[in-house]
Amino acid sequence: MERGRIDNGAGTDLAWQRLGGRGPTLVFLPGFGSDMTGDKATALAALCQERGQAVLLFDYSGHGASGGTFTDGTIGRWAADALAAIDGLTAGPLVLVGSSMGGWIGLLAALARPGRMAGFVGVAAAPDFTEALMWESMLPAERATLERDGVLHIPSPYGEPTPITRALIEDGRQHLLMGAPIPLACPVRLLHGQADADVPWETSLRLAQRLTGEDVQVVLVKDGE
């Protein structure tokens, strides 16, 4: 596995890992707070190595081994990171594989580079999650804290409380997708566990309805998390 760093175009280095092979190249887009050392990323890399298929893993700014600060991140910045990695480190047709927030980032990247899309895979994809799963679930007092302080720390089952910034919420509103048709023509596969405690499985059904392409399939795993 080749490793390196690439500038995201805004002065921040992004860490990446890449494996050469046959196309299309798979690009993994991690979730909020996750990185390329996670289980899904490493499993995908192992599968690609076994199949002799090209794959690119990378960390968003403020995540994993990349530079930057997590609380400076927004959906727009992380989508720009994804495009910097895709444009600078891949060539030819792509299959984007997005997990949770990575599904949203991946959709934004796919819409920005439609001519390169050979396919899109969403794993519990969470487009618009800053609004639908964060802002709309906040209590009035939590919203007031966020507006006043610019950051709200919410409990996380995975470790330390997660900082949610006002900038993340406000920027997310500039990139919402689920309120209109999503013009993505490539084949799409949406995988979702019905026991997912973070992203409701119905999200994938709604996303499938919004996608305008004809080749869209949703796979639900009844006991999957």
Predicted segment positions?
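Gly/Ala-rich beta-loop-alpha elbow adjacent to hydrolase catalytic centers
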Residues: 98-106
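Alpha/beta-hydrolase active-site loop signature
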Residues: 33, 60-65, 127, 225
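The serine-hydrolase catalytic nucleophile loop
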Residues: 32-45, 202
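N-terminal cap/lid segment of alpha/beta-hydrolase-fold proteins
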Residues: 1-20
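Conserved alpha/beta-hydrolase
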Residues: 43-67
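The alpha/beta-hydrolase serine catalytic core
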Residues: 95, 116-221, 225
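Short beta-strand element of the alpha/beta-hydrolase
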Residues: 23-31
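Catalytic nucleophile-loop/oxyanion-hole region of alpha/beta-hydrolase
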Residues: 64-89
